[in-house]
């Protein structure tokens, strides 16, 4: 330090205040920076490009079911590492990491609640838990939810988002395709409606079983739906796939699903479908939500 700098007055600068974490969210599609409160009010749909941001199951069911009496079902059914499976990491360590990151015990949550006053059973997958994969506990939770619907003669709704069967459980995970299909056949015997909602992504063994067995199959816009992913298919057939292949709009155009519905309209749409399928009076919808 020279004599000149010693003569200069010291200038204090105000501490720079950072923006609190979680106030803003960047859209994964258009990269617009969105105010978190406004985004949540819009049900996690980007107001700029209408991209449907992935939801955890509790947030999804909180948006879907009426406030008030809600009962979680089958939460005591937990995953078990029967095969002592290990790839680059032990399966039990993967489970522990997923449980810590998501604060959930498994990749499926099941609730009994109401939709515009009408009781239903609803299930939702968690893509943030081991890719929403279906293992023995997921299949058992799903079956328990359907059995509860049968017992109380209620409609059943499932929101799927999954990479498929959980490879760390081997054949035990593949058994769940048959189990979930069989229990849904029982639901159909009682003439109780099953509404399947496909969200991004719904792939593999889940898409090949419970996801495509709905009396009405609905998809959120631009959801990736299929068995193998498009990159795997292109590498196998050595051809470029059509634009939009395996997206919900493509599947609707080719008759694989029944409807593509914006998330903000799902509750009113499903409520109307259920009343039609169960021969009940139309639900008392708010004016802005009427379909």
Swiss-Prot record:
Protein keywords: ATP-binding, Cytoplasm, Fatty acid biosynthesis, Fatty acid metabolism, Lipid biosynthesis, Lipid metabolism, Metal-binding, Nucleotide-binding, Transferase, Zinc, Zinc-finger
One Pfam assignment: Carboxyl_trans
Subcellular localization: Cytoplasm
Cysteines joined through disulfide linkages: none
Pathways per UniProt: Lipid metabolism; malonyl-CoA biosynthesis; malonyl-CoA from acetyl-CoA: step 1/1
Zinc-finger ranges (C4-type): 27-49
Domain CoA carboxyltransferase N-terminal: 23-291
Reaction catalysed by this enzyme: N(6)-carboxybiotinyl-L-lysyl-[protein] + acetyl-CoA = N(6)-biotinyl-L-lysyl-[protein] + malonyl-CoA
Superkingdom field: Bacteria
UniProt remark on cofactor binding: Binds 1 zinc ion per subunit.
Keyword Metal-binding: yes
One cellular component (GO) term of this entry: acetate CoA-transferase complex
SUPFAM superfamilies (UniProt xref): ClpP/crotonase
An annotated Gene Ontology molecular function: carboxyl- or carbamoyltransferase activity
Binding site residues for Zn(2+): 27, 30, 46, 49
EC number of the protein: 2.1.3.15
GO BP of this protein: fatty acid biosynthetic process; malonyl-CoA biosynthetic process; negative regulation of translation
Record keyword Zinc present: yes
Main location group: cytoplasm
Cofactor: Zn(2+)
Family to which the UniProt record says this protein belongs: Belongs to the AccD/PCCB family.
SUBUNIT field: Acetyl-CoA carboxylase is a heterohexamer composed of biotin carboxyl carrier protein (AccB), biotin carboxylase (AccC) and two subunits each of ACCase subunit alpha (AccA) and ACCase subunit beta (AccD).
Role summary: Component of the acetyl coenzyme A carboxylase (ACC) complex. Biotin carboxylase (BC) catalyzes the carboxylation of biotin on its carrier protein (BCCP) and then the CO(2) group is transferred by the transcarboxylase to acetyl-CoA to form malonyl-CoA.
NCBIfam families linked: accD
Listed name of the protein: Acetyl-coenzyme A carboxylase carboxyl transferase subunit beta
Species this chain originates from: Coxiella burnetii (strain RSA 493 / Nine Mile phase I)
Organism placement in taxonomy: Bacteria, Pseudomonadati, Pseudomonadota, Gammaproteobacteria, Legionellales
């Amino acid at each position: 330090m020279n004599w000149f700098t010693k003569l200069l007055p010291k200038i204090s600068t105000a501490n720079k205040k950072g923006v609190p974490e979680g106030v803003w969210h960047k859209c994964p599609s258009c990269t617009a920076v969105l105010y978190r409160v406004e985004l949540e009010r819009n049900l996690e749909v980007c107001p700029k490009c209408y991209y449907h941001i992935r939801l955890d199951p509790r947030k999804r069911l909180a948006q879907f079911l009426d406030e008030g009496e809600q009962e979680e079902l089958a939460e005591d059914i937990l995953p078990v590492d029967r095969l002592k499976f290990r790839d680059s990491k032990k399966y039990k360590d993967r489970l522990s990491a997923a449980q810590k990151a998501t604060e959930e015990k498994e990749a499926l949550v099941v609730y009994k609640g109401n939709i515009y006053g009408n009781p239903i059973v609803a299930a939702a997958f968690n893509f943030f838990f081991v890719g929403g994969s279906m293992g023995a506990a997921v299949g058992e939770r799903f079956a328990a939810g359907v059995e509860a619907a049968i017992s109380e003669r209620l409609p059943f709704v499932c929101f799927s988002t999954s990479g498929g069967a959980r490879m760390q459980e081997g054949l035990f995970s593949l058994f769940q395709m048959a189990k979930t299909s069989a229990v849904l056949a029982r639901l159909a015997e009682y003439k109780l409606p099953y509404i399947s909602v496909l969200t991004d992504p719904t792939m593999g063994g889940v898409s090949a079983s419970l996801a495509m067995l709905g009396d009405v199959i609905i998809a959120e816009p631009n959801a990736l739906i299929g068995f193998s992913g498009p990159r795997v298919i292109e590498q196998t057939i050595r051809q470029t796939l059509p634009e939009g292949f395996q997206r919900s709009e493509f599947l609707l155009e080719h008759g694989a699903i029944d409807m593509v519905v914006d998330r903000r309209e799902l509750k009113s749409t499903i409520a109307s479908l259920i009343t039609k399928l169960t021969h009940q009076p139309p639900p008392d919808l708010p004016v802005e939500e009427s379909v």
